[in-house]
Regions:
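Extracellular glycosylation-rich, acidic/polar low-complexity regions of adhesion-
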Residues: 1-218
Length: 218
């Protein structure tokens, strides 16, 4: 655990800091935060030695979202002598990477007239780990068409059908998604839904499913 001892009994404060995350402590023991803030990357805990140690015993570190790599926990404890003295120590923290699912972006609800093509704007996908594998698009009462860009291929379904699966790099898939066109079935009017499922290529693949409603006016 993390603790501090002052043999003279005049401990005043302990400052704790990390570079790539946040720190939280419990103040139930009576310590106060005199600088920084709970749930931030740095704070200074003040109180008696017992109060400070109670707070230090409750430290929780949370890395920043999607961060992995090396971080450093630094503690600087200072006494209240006429000429204050301090002690500085550090602990290395290794944050291992974990797979994150891809994230789809879709526009809001769409409206189009019967027998009129609808050009989708704002359809994209992002995988922060860079291992996007595929994006499946489907509708119930119409067809979808895309212009294949770069090395993107259709690995299931087909252009001009109600469902198709795009495979390729994230850049190429997004360039292809920018060309997405919906066409309702002949003489169809009513409600339809575009469903988008993007999956990554991790050992245990993760996916994101999103939908956008389409109203086809008569």
């Amino acid at each position: 655990g993390v603790s501090v001892t002052d043999i003279d009994g005049n401990l005043a404060s302990s400052q704790i800091t990390v570079n790539n995350g946040t720190l939280s402590v419990s103040l139930a023991g009576g310590a106060t935060i005199s600088a920084g803030a709970n749930g931030s990357s740095t704070m200074t805990i003040s109180g008696s030695e017992a109060q400070i140690n109670t707070a230090l015993a409750s430290i929780v570190y949370q890395s920043n979202a999607d961060f992995n790599g090396a971080d450093v926990f630094t503690i600087v404890s200072t006494d209240s002598a006429g000429t204050p003295l301090s002690d500085i120590d550090t602990v290395g923290i290794t944050v291992n990477p974990v797979n994150d699912p891809p994230v789809n972006t879709l526009p809001g609800a769409q409206t189009v007239d019967e027998d009129t093509p609808l050009n989708f704007v704002g359809v994209s996908v992002n995988d922060i780990d860079g291992n996007l594998a595929s994006t499946q698009l489907s509708v119930n009462n119409g067809t979808l068409n895309v212009t294949l860009t770069g090395g993107t291929t259709i690995t299931a379904g087909s252009n001009g059908s109600g469902t198709l699966t795009l495979s390729g790099t994230q850049t190429d898939i997004n360039a292809t998604l920018a060309s997405l066109v919906y066409q309702g079935d002949l003489n169809f009017n009513g409600s339809d839904v575009l469903t988008m499922i993007s999956a990554d290529s991790a050992g245990t693949p993760l996916s994101d499913t999103d939908t956008v409603s389409i109203t086809v006016n008569p």
